């Protein structure tokens, strides 16, 4: 087994799908290496033959290729190497990649105006490396199948809940005057809308899949792999985000609940700013601009008290009004009756 390549590196690495001239759609893997002779190892597996190829790039080769393209100073060389290490984590940023005289050549942007082309040479694939790469691919495909299946289960549950809501709304709409006419106008029989209103089963999905065409074609396989790999990356990003959120919960600023400062009638009980800054009240000088407003508030409060006393002094009016309400009760409109059919 090549001591430079380890199984853990393959399992943790980021696979991507690229179209390579002469090989068609391929799975690619870029690995940073800590070997004194190799800084980058590239694994290429054709989807047609499932035969792995390995390409290597040394520090000396990288320096010579950069110098031949005009990057001679050490600052530029270090910048290109750092950018190359970033590309290994996000191989989708590679502009072009292809086979040229058995070498794997790829290019990437160092800046908006500068592009660097790198030429990696083929390396012998030992028997142990061959099986290690294929084993890693099998584990990757199993994980993608499991992720796709779990995603399908969650999506099916969501669609079932939405179908129940749609059925309830249809029943409620048919129960209203003119509701059936609205449905028939929007979704007449044998129309696309009418078909969308019907419940969909697994058999219906399989029939649509069969009528879709040659879904087992190589292009469809490559597109499916791209979709699943993208879904896996999103899942990992969300998982890392939630884990970091759980770790940072203790460091977040917690605001007090509304009921801490307000009672059930939403009347202010305590000023939170004054509690936080007990000595700030003496530093604030009152402004004369707000005096008329305080008089207005006192006058309005006095009027409210007078109105309240008048309402207490006229109980007969309230009694007569309540009797009128009892004599002429309001009619309630029945709406949205649901029919249950056995």
Curated annotation (Swiss-Prot):
Keyword annotations from UniProtKB, A to Z: Cytoplasm, DNA damage, DNA repair, Membrane, Nucleus, Transmembrane, Transmembrane helix
Result of changing residue 204 to G: In strain: DBVPG6044 and Y55
GO terms under cellular component: cytoplasm; DNA ligase IV complex; nuclear membrane; nucleus; site of double-strand break
Positions with biased composition (Basic and acidic residues): 286-296
Membrane topology: Multi-pass membrane protein
Result of changing residue 249 to E: In strain: DBVPG1135, DBVPG1373, DBVPG1378, DBVPG1788, DBVPG1794, DBVPG1853, DBVPG3051, DBVPG6763, DBVPG6765 and SK1
Protein name: Non-homologous end-joining protein 1
Source organism per UniProt: Saccharomyces cerevisiae (strain ATCC 204508 / S288c) (Baker's yeast)
Source taxonomy: Eukaryota, Fungi, Dikarya, Ascomycota, Saccharomycotina
